């Protein structure tokens, strides 16, 4: 029987070697898989860090540019406001000057017209008194004193035009 046991032992020996080899290979594969996993995790972390850093730099750049645009816009708006204010002031001054000139012209016209109207009124009054006296004289209603006072007022074109 010893030979059967020897054969059995010798037959199991390669199987044991195969199992041991398989175990060693499995352990080696596990180690390599773990190393690959660690390497991938490390690379992913590094990529994430670079992405965050890049995002921060980009955000800072965009923020700086946006601030510069905002500042430039404010400056432009302020300049436009100042220009408009200056134009408004000039327009107000010009309108005030024109209003004052119109007022002076109106006053001068009023004075001139008033003088003409006063002169014309005096002439009409004188003519009416002359006509009244003439009618009284015609009908003999005038007294002796009034007959001597009768005067004739004439209106000529040159006296009506006083400038």
UniProtKB/Swiss-Prot annotation:
Q: Does the keyword Calcium apply?
A: no
Gene3D superfamilies linked: Apolipoprotein
Basic and acidic residues bias spans: 28-56, 67-84, 91-113
Write out the biased-composition intervals (Low complexity). 152-163
- What ranges does the record give for the region Disordered, renumbered to this chain? 1-117, 139-163
Source organism per UniProt = Daucus carota (Wild carrot)
Q: Where are the sequence repeats?
A: 32-42, 43-53, 65-75, 76-86, 87-97, 103-115
Domain of life of the organism in this record? Answer: Eukaryota
Map out region (6 X 11 AA approximate repeats) in residue numbers.
Answer: 32-115
Q: List the disulfide bonds.
A: none
Name the protein family.
Answer: Belongs to the LEA type 4 family.
Q: Which UniProt keywords apply?
A: Repeat
One GO cellular component term of this record is:
nucleus
Name of the protein in question: Late embryogenesis abundant protein Dc3
> Where do transmembrane segments lie in this chain?
none
């Amino acid at each position: 029987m010893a030979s059967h046991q020897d054969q059995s032992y010798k037959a199991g020996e390669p199987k044991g070697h195969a199992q041991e080899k398989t175990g060693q290979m499995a352990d080696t594969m596990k180690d390599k898989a773990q190393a690959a996993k660690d390497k991938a995790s490390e690379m992913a972390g590094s990529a994430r860090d670079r992405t965050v850093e890049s995002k921060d730099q980009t955000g800072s750049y965009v923020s700086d540019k946006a601030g510069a645009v905002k500042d430039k816009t404010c400056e432009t708006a302020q300049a436009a406001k100042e220009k408009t204010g200056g134009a408004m002031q000039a327009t107000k001054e010009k309108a005030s000057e024109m209003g004052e000139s119109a007022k002076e012209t109106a006053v001068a016209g009023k004075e001139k017209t008033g003088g003409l109207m006063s002169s014309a009124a005096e002439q009409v009054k004188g003519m009416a008194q002359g006509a009244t006296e003439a009618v009284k004289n015609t009908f003999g209603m005038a007294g002796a004193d009034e007959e001597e006072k009768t005067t004739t007022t004439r209106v000529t074109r040159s006296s009506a035009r006083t400038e």
